[in-house]
Amino acid sequence: VYKRQMCDSTNAERKGFTMSERTVGRTFDNIFAEHRNTRIIIATFASNVDRVQQIINSAYKYGRKVAVEGRSMVNVIGTAAELGYLKIPDKTLIDIDQLKNYPDEKVVLITTGSQGESMAALSRMAASIHKKVTIKPNDTIIFSSNPIPGNEKAVSKVINELSMKGAKVIFQDVHVSGHACQEEIKLIYSLVKPKYAIPVHGEYRHLKANAGIAKMLGIPKENIFILKSGNVLELSDKEAK
């Protein structure tokens, strides 16, 4: 049976290796130290449990309570804590309704909406239609994510709306991609040694960059398949077509 490899293409245009998640933890620590007197709101992917853990670690270190907003964020954090994947110190987590009982400099809000989704919590805060959180001048708002290709305009809109409310928005050096860069893509192709390469997950230019790496590593052009949505690829023990 020939090996067929479907490989993530999102960062196929980026040289080098993806940086360690630990670098974000150091950045959080610096931001918390520099913004001791403001409320901190952090938007990130609900699925990134390790990122949430690093936020909680910094919050605990600097004496802040942590509230969570956004259905997916609440669900993931609850499940991760229950299963032991997330370590939350006692009395650190508070309900969002309790935010008003603490000074701004003593709280952190972890929220959904890092991609500018119109109905996500942060977008509703930016548009002044969130029922429980009102953006205040001098709030420090961190986008711990990069815009997924195609979401740049929506994210920029939310950042502008937050800035117009007087908030300080930080979006540089507070995210490490969860996707492989070129050297990791080369590594996985070298380890698996597939006969057929099927670049996936990305726009066409990302798939094409991935295909270029596969070809460079010796996979014949006719064995590399760049597929569009709706294309059918037939795979058998002997061939792919």
Feature names for model-found ranges:
Residues 1-2:
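Short, small-residue-biased leader/transition segments that mark boundaries at the very start
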Residues 14-144, 148-241:
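Hard-cation-handling environments
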